[in-house]
Each structure stands twice: as structure tokens, then as C-alpha cells.
Amino acid sequence: MGASGSKARGLWPFASAAGGGGSEAAGAEQALVRPRGRAVPPFVFTRRGSMFYDEDGDLAHEFYEETIVTKNGQKRAKLRRVHKNLIPQGIVKLDHPRIHVDFPVILYEV
């Protein structure tokens, strides 16, 4: 619970080009970004949206519909959550860039 790092295997985009992982690499100053191929920025500009559109085009996290239930001769209104016919919001552009969760730099304030 709480782990939000990527689970993809393979080349890590923020790995240093120096390679090696011995004691000499531990003492050396850590390079920030040295990708092997194309340069990968440490920032995230978009995210996956967490809201949904319903049939009417309304945007919300959850949708409910009112149903009338008759029990012992009494009519009662209940809310039922709608799960069908919802369209995901898709990709949302962030207002300002954020640092990628897998970027290997610790930020601190003095």
C-alpha cells in the first residue's frame, strides 16, 4: 500500500551512463540524468484522469441514480451507484510540471 513507482522492467530512464556499481561508484558524486539513448526529462506534464463522463456529458468521480423501493406498502427513495455507460476522462494536462516518482534525487529544505 502506498507504493506508486512504476512496475515496468527494463532500462531505467534515469540510470547513469557510468555503469558499474562498485565501491568507486558509491564514493563518486551522483550524476543526475545521463540516459544512454534520447534524453528523458525528470518532469511529468500529464496524468491519467480520475473522473468519468456519463451519458449526459456530466463529469464527476461517481454517479448515482434515484430508485423507488416499495417495502411494506411504503415507497422509499434510494440512491444506487451507476457503473455502466461511463467514459473515462482520459489524459489530463497538469497546471505545472511535477517531478517523476522514479527520479533518483532526494529533495530537502535546509
From Swiss-Prot:
Pfam families named among the record's database cross-references: TUSC2
Tissue: Strong expression in heart, lung, skeletal muscle, kidney, and pancreas, followed by brain and liver, lowest levels in placenta.
PANTHER family tied to this protein: TUMOR SUPPRESSOR CANDIDATE 2 (PTHR15453:SF8)
One GO CC term, this protein: mitochondrion
Protein name: Tumor suppressor candidate 2
Top-rank taxon: Eukaryota
Annotated function: May function as a tumor suppressor, inhibiting colony formation, causing G1 arrest and ultimately inducing apoptosis in homozygous 3p21.3 120-kb region-deficient cells.
InterPro entries: FUS1
Keyword set includes Phosphoprotein: yes
PTM-bearing positions, type Phosphoserine: 50
Cell cycle among keywords: yes
Organism of provenance: Homo sapiens (Human)
Family: Belongs to the TUSC2 family.
UniProt PTM: Myristoylation is required for tumor suppressor activity.
A GO BP entry: phagocytosis
Keyword terms of this UniProt record: Cell cycle, Lipoprotein, Myristate, Phosphoprotein, Tumor suppressor
Residues linked to a lipid group, N-myristoyl glycine type: 2
